[in-house]
Design a protein with these regions (language model features):
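Structural alpha-helical scaffold elements that stabilize or flank donor/cofactor-binding regions
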Residues: 9-13, 68, 120, 197, ...
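Catalytic binding pocket for nucleotide-activated donors in carbohydrate/polymer assembly enzymes
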Residues: 72, 88, 199-267, 273-274, ...
Length: 299
């Protein structure tokens, strides 16, 4: 985001660029400055602000970032509270919701899980660890997995060292690439499958909640899958709302996650799981329409 690089980029594309669009927090001050000077319309969508958001802080870095945000022709927020906070700083915005809801619902309707994994699951209850890290995997290693209760792990990192580490936690597990299905635990060691795998899951353990923050919870929600995560969800509006709707459960520690998962898998909790899954899907469905609203403002 330097003056020379931004200038070179715009000079190479200026005749073709009709507008610039960014998502959530992707804002580059120098780029915004030169877009404004070049009269190229700019938009940012799916933004979410809290009083602690960096551009809203009364500090030198905060004022610098706020200046960059002020150069957008239109800011689309996810909710009223974000727009209210921006208004206090003199910035106008439009509440448009989160266009990711449209995308994940479309994915849920068109994606298909591999047939061999569907056959492997059969009628068992399947727990899918999506974008997992070592904390979630350690918690899952304390659960007994059987023919009727199976585990699929799709780790955030799939390099060979990490896959080997996971296999050492679950000696009975096999890699998906081995095509060996005589096991109750499969570790996904290829990319691009996670979205479709949620169609098989009865419960999703979404990773990241014990680190910098959880990974995508809208994808499992779009498939009507109840979720368990670590506690770090507050930066993610959709996760907070899913928890309020009882579609997402948090566990303060990996040990608590193990206990929570065992409780949810208990035979007398079938209806609670169904209600959580239904609440997840209803939440995503209620968020749709954002993409159409945003596109109506674009040149």
């Amino acid at each position: 985001d330097t003056p020379r690089r931004v200038r070179a980029f715009l000079n190479s594309t200026a005749r073709e660029v009709k507008f610039f669009a960014s998502c959530k927090y992707e804002v580059w001050p120098e780029l915004m400055k030169q877009l404004s000077e070049s009269k190229i319309p700019s938009f940012v969508f799916a933004t979410h602000f809290t009083p602690k958001s960096s551009p809203l802080k009364n500090s030198l870095p905060g004022r610098f970032l706020l200046r960059a945000w002020s150069r957008f022709d239109m800011i689309f927020t996810q909710d009223e509270s974000s727009s209210s906070l921006l208004k206090l700083k003199g910035l106008n915005s439009v509440v448009a919701g989160d266009p990711r809801a449209d995308r994940v619902l479309s994915i849920s309707k068109h994606s298909r899980a591999p047939e061999d994994l569907k056959a492997w699951k059969g009628d068992a209850n399947l727990v899918l660890a999506g974008s997992s890290w070592f904390q979630e995997e350690g918690a899952l290693a304390s659960v007994v997995w059987t023919e009727n209760r199976k585990l699929m792990i799709a780790p955030h990192e799939i390099h060979s060292e990490n896959i080997d580490r996971i296999l050492s936690l679950f000696p009975q597990a096999t890699r998906y690439s081995s095509k060996s299905f005589e096991t109750n635990i499969i570790v996904i060691d290829s990319i691009g499958l996670l979205s479709s795998l949620y169609s098989l899951a009865d419960i999703a353990v979404v990773g990241g909640g014990y680190g910098k923050g959880i990974h995508n919870v809208l994808e499992p929600a779009a498939f009507g899958v109840p979720m368990i995560t670590g506690p770090k969800i507050n930066r993610f509006r959709e996760a907070v709302l899913l928890k309020q709707h009882s579609a997402l459960h948090t566990a303060a520690t990996p040990l608590a996650l193990t206990k929570k998962l065992k409780a949810l898998l208990a035979p007398d909790n079938t209806q609670q799981l169904k209600r959580s899954g239904d609440a997840a899907l209803s939440f995503v469905t209620d968020q749709t329409g954002s993409a159409e609203k945003i596109s109506s403002y674009l040149p």
